[in-house]
Amino acid sequence: LRDITISVEENEFVAIMGSSGCGKTTLLNLLGGLENPTHGCVYINDVDITQLSMEERSSFRRWHIGFIFQNFNLIPEMNVFENIVLPAKLMERNISKKEVMRIAEELEIEEKLLQNPMTLSGGQQQRVAIARAIYTHPTILLGDELTGNLDSTTSISVMKFLKKMCKKYSQTMIIVTHDERIAAMADRIIQMKDGRVV
């Protein structure tokens, strides 16, 4: 990445587009504190996360950022319900079965809650990962091709639900996508080329 300066407002839905290898995922990783820039800062809620220790950054991510990446990282030793509520348990928050069910119904996985996630299709696993990311209502939701394993109709349906949830809870959503239909749903599109915003 080179000479990138972007500002994203609270409750804004931003889509990042560009050809493969242009730096979209790297930018997303920087915004989520998964990588450090060689120069510059990353401010979230007036906190420069590049200055946080690894422990502080991990805690900050847990409380403020939800991730939906292409690698779902579901835990096979837990059922679907337990995977969804895991971040809340790590944060020592109360678990609302009603809220889990509401999200699961929206994502059409309500009948899978007691199953092992490894027995589900790729699309169903992706919906479990989405449910897990949004269950704690993070300040920022980051997604890398978050509907990549879903068919076109389901992709649009899931994105409409995510957009509704973000508006309801004043969340900011930043996603990387190659799908122009998904990008068209965003408030703003950032185009990248050769490591730069164009």
Regions found by a protein language model. Give the residues of each.
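ABC family nucleotide-binding domain
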Residues: 1-185, 189
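H-loop (His-switch) and adjacent beta-strand-loop-beta switch element
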Residues: 189-198
